[in-house]
Amino acid sequence: MNIFRDFEKKLEGLFEGVILRAFKRGVHPVEIGKKLARECEGNKTIGVSRVYVPNRYEVGLSPRDHSRFESYQAVLATELENLLITYVKEHGYAVLDRPRVKLVEVGRLREGEFWIKSRMEGELPQPHEPVETDDGILRPRDTGGPAVLEIMDSGEG
């Protein structure tokens, strides 16, 4: 599966690069949002009872694109983080804490080019040995281990 995903990413990069250079200038936030969702989807980790997705995202931008976003970078990052939260909710995924997006300048990128790197920061909850109680029933041990943020839909629109 990874071979196909890598191949798809290479084709996507070639295609997007040609199209971007031919028809437009600069990166638009909507493009970053779409690519963040793909990055999230492509880097799932299947846990014992949940599917985890990355919670840290770094967006590499050309110097020119980075400077265009500079005056509202914090607002844009928050908007992209909220987009990821919505995506996580809609797909029933779990994250170790609130997703964070950081925009960084990468000198070797040309205007309109960008990349995204993601990772999981924190620890996945570990399964624990059950404890036998006085009544002979095995119950999960309360370990006070790492917290997991599971985003649930409240049903409010």
Model-derived features with residue positions:
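RNA-contacting regions in translation and RNA-metabolism proteins
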Residues: 1-19, 23, 129-130
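Short acidic, glycine/proline-enriched loop segments that cap or flank alpha-helices
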Residues: 24, 45-51, 64-76, 87-96
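Intrinsically disordered, low-complexity acidic Ser/Thr-rich regulatory segments
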Residues: 15-19, 30-42, 78, 82, ...
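Extended hydrophobic secondary-structure segments that form protein cores and membrane-embedded regions
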Residues: 58-60, 100-103
